[in-house]
Swiss-Prot record:
Ligand binding (heme b b562): 84, 183
UniProt KW Transit peptide keyword: no
Cofactor binding note: Binds 2 heme b groups non-covalently.
Record PROSITE patterns: CYTB_CTER, CYTB_NTER
Record-listed heme b b566 binding positions: 98, 197
Other comment: Heme 1 (or BL or b562) is low-potential and absorbs at about 562 nm, and heme 2 (or BH or b566) is high-potential and absorbs at about 566 nm.
GO biological process, one term: mitochondrial electron transport, ubiquinol to cytochrome c
Protein name: Cytochrome b
Single GO term (MF): metal ion binding
Matches recorded under CDD domains: cytochrome_b_C (cd00290), Cytochrome_b_N (cd00284)
Binding site for a ubiquinone: 202
Spans traversing the lipid bilayer: 34-54, 78-99, 114-134, 179-199, 227-247, 289-309, 321-341, 348-368
Length: 380
């Protein structure tokens, strides 16, 4: 009998075990689609990014012009740029929904998978930040100045660290050059981390909406979830293309159409929409070091969620109190996002401070308390 190449070839076997014969729970919902959507986002960003890098010049005198040249003179350059810029937004939409799914259904109890996932989020945020600097518009320049300056809040070594990151005494040509190098490198780091993420996931298998073991009822990944994923790809890519074609600048800052000028500060320096919640937390603390610590904590707090799980039930499916808290947290993050886009004045300051306080309180205090109370109420 001939060997089945798919199951015996060293490389094809790995692909087979990950994408074809992988045993998957029979009841995972559309919330489980975002992992594969993130994979498509990553592939799209790497392809469009590579094409853009072929025409980009990492020099302060030429960067802005090279991007303009791309949009005017390169075949479909405008489309490639719009897909890349808006692809970043879709990447963050997918990762936030993916994390929300993980929090709701208790997926964070796969600790290794979850921790690698948080590192992936940090890598994605770093990539997006250095990428935003490359067009060398006003918001690129001032965003880079403000965010890199935060490192100067670190006691003793802060200022040295910032000047080392800048490659000089301000954001200038060396900064742009190294940010381009980092923006090229980091997506491949993300690819590597993604493989680690999947390796850990396939050790334990996927969680499911009920949060119960599903070993007794598994189905092969192909054809069931391959077709389901392809539907997700089609929907997301059509949304991305629609945004890139009909409203390419909807999510961008008009300030970035002005070339970078160190002598003119924009009236409102703010990051892209996907960083606004963290930016609001940073701004809500009237102390530089405190703000930086809160900013870091807003993401790093995700590492603590597996340790703060007090419920006897894995998922929130049968936990109404935790559900209320979860959706309050979602609303809270949306409020933070909105506040981050507003100027620093009354009433936005106090709203931001209250929302920041609530964000940490829900995650660190109320989730564990509600879960413990639910154990009592359900006599678990």
């Amino acid at each position: 009998m001939a060997l089945n190449l798919r199951k015996n070839h060293q490389i094809l076997k790995i692909i087979n075990d990950a994408l074809i014969d992988l045993p998957a729970p029979s009841n995972i919902s559309t919330w489980w689609n975002f992992g594969s959507l993130l994979g498509i986002c990553l592939i799209t960003q790497i392809i469009t990014g590579l094409l853009l890098a072929m025409h980009y010049t990492a020099d302060t005198n030429l960067a802005f012009s090279s991007v303009a040249h791309m949009c005017r003179d390169v075949q479909f350059g405008w489309l490639i740029r719009n897909l890349h810029a808006n692809g970043a937004s879709f990447f963050f939409i997918c990762i936030y929904l993916h994390i929300g799914r993980g929090l709701y259904y208790g997926s964070y109890l796969n600790k290794e998978t979850w921790n690698v996932g948080v590192v992936l989020l940090l890598a994605l945020m770093a990539t997006a930040f250095v990428g935003y600097v490359l067009p060398w518009g006003q918001m690129s320049f001032w965003g880079a100045t403000v965010i890199t300056n935060l490192f100067s809040a670190i006691p003793y070594i802060g200022q040295t660290l910032v000047e080392w990151a800048w490659g000089g005494f301000s954001v200038d040509n060396p900064t742009l050059t190294r940010f381009f190098a980092l923006h090229f490198l980091l997506p491949f780091v993300i690819v590597g981390l993604t493989l680690v993420h999947l390796t850990f996931l396939h050790e334990t298998g996927s969680n499911n909406p009920l949060g119960i073991p599903s070993d007794c009822d598994k189905i092969p990944f192909h054809p069931y979830y391959t077709i389901k994923d392809i539907l997700g790809f089609a929907l997301m890519l059509s949304l991305l293309v629609s945004l890139a074609l009909f409203a390419p600048n909807l999510l961008g800052d008009p300030e970035n159409f002005t070339p970078a000028n160190p002598l003119v500060t924009p009236p409102h320096i703010k990051p892209e929409w996907y960083f606004l919640f963290a930016y609001a937390i940073l701004r809500s603390i009237p102390n530089k070091l405190g703000g930086v610590l809160a900013l870091a904590a807003s993401i790093l707090v995700l590492f603590l969620t597996p340790l703060l799980h007090t419920s006897k039930l894995r998922s929130m499916t049968f936990r109404p109190l935790s559900q209320i808290l979860f959706w309050t947290l979602v609303a809270n993050v949306l409020i933070l996002t909105w506040v981050g886009s507003q100027p620093v004045e009354h009433p936005f300051i106090i709203i931001g401070q209250l929302a920041s306080f609530t964000y940490f309180t829900i995650i660190l205090v109320l989730f564990p308390l509600a879960a413990a109370l639910e154990n009592k109420l359900l006599k678990l």
